[in-house]
Amino acid sequence: MTETTPDDTLIAALWRIIATHGWSGLTMRRLAAEAGVETASLRERFPTRLDLLLLHGRLIDQAVLAGTIPGQGGSVRDRLFDVLMRRLDAMQPYREGLLQLFEDMRRDPVIALALSPHIGISMRWMLEAAEVEAKSCEARLLGLGLAGVWLATIRAWARDDSADMAATMAALDNALDRAERIARSLGLLRGDGEPTISEPVAETS
């Protein structure tokens, strides 16, 4: 069994509060009480509420990367499908809070704007998890494309309350199809589905 860390406890408390009170109801004092930590310790690490969401994103990235088996084989498309489904699996315990945040983002698009560059960074890490190698400039393009795939998948996931997530998987499959066609048209993929370049994706900033 995976050991629960203080950050895990904090993030679980974060999403419980958002699920109950919404983004507008999230305060550092309320979070400190829910997580059983001192408010001063939150101030030291999290200047703003956005920093809490960024922590959650990093933890999800780390969970996916930790579950990646080196040399996993298969096509790029299959590896990306696996990586993004594992990302959704890591998010599933926080589904109620995430869905509430999505609703709040419709009313306050500033949240989405603030998060958008960090989604691109996370997607470049997902390329790493899928063992997709590319030069930095191509990696940025592939990361942007994967962000589009991810957002389309998240929209389906938000509507999909089935246990097997069949609708979500179908949406991901379709989004990957579209992304693959676009990547081929831009010369970013070879005929075998691998990137046309073969240097590591390393740059993530």
Locations of the language-model features?
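Short, basic, alpha-helical segments at the C-terminal edge of helix-turn-helix-like DNA-binding modules
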Residues: 57-64
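Short, hydrophobic secondary-structure boundary micro-motifs
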Residues: 27, 99-101, 114, 135, ...
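Amphipathic alpha-helical packing segments from all-alpha helical-bundle domains
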Residues: 110-132, 137-152, 170
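Amphipathic alpha-helical interaction segments
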Residues: 30, 82, 86, 100, ...
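C-terminal peripheral helix-coil segments that are non-catalytic and often amphipathic
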Residues: 128, 159-205
